[in-house]
Amino acid sequence: MRQSANLVRKHIVVTGLVQGVGFRYFTVTQARRLGVQGWVRNCRDGSVELEAQGSSDAVQALVEQLAIGPRWSEVSHVAVHDMPIIDETARAFGVRQ
């Protein structure tokens, strides 16, 4: 995980054209590259939901990448909310069903 003074956990919902375009796998790739832990999944309403925990810098960088998205996506909004930090020692970022 990138070094930072602050460990944060965020609940994030991304809306727009974000399903069927590789958005979850893009998210996993970016999160792992940044050393962020958590999960991502598709929602029935067409959005993508995730929880991300890591240094404040790494999570902010992930949010910035989510706002861009993979090539075929069209992100209309990224909602970010604070969550309590949990112990996820050694858990890799992954896809949930």
Swiss-Prot record:
Chain coiled-coil ranges: none
Tell me which UniProt keywords the record has, alphabetically: Hydrolase
Q: Give any Pfam family that matches.
A: Acylphosphatase
Top-level taxon: Bacteria
Q: Where is the Acylphosphatase-like domain?
A: 9-97
Q: What positions does UniProt annotate as the active site of this protein?
A: 24, 42
Q: What catalytic reaction does the record list?
A: an acyl phosphate + H2O = a carboxylate + phosphate + H(+)
EC number of this enzyme: 3.6.1.7
Q: What class of enzyme is it?
A: hydrolase
> Do you know which InterPro entries this protein is assigned to?
Acylphosphatase (IPR020456), Acylphosphatase-like_dom (IPR001792), Acylphosphatase-like_dom_sf (IPR036046), Acylphosphatase_CS (IPR017968)
GO MF terms on file?
acylphosphatase activity
Q: Does the keyword Hydrolase apply?
A: yes
Q: Which NCBIfam families did the record assign?
A: PRK14428.1
Identify its protein family.
Belongs to the acylphosphatase family.
What protein name applies here? Acylphosphatase
Species annotation? Bifidobacterium longum (strain NCC 2705)
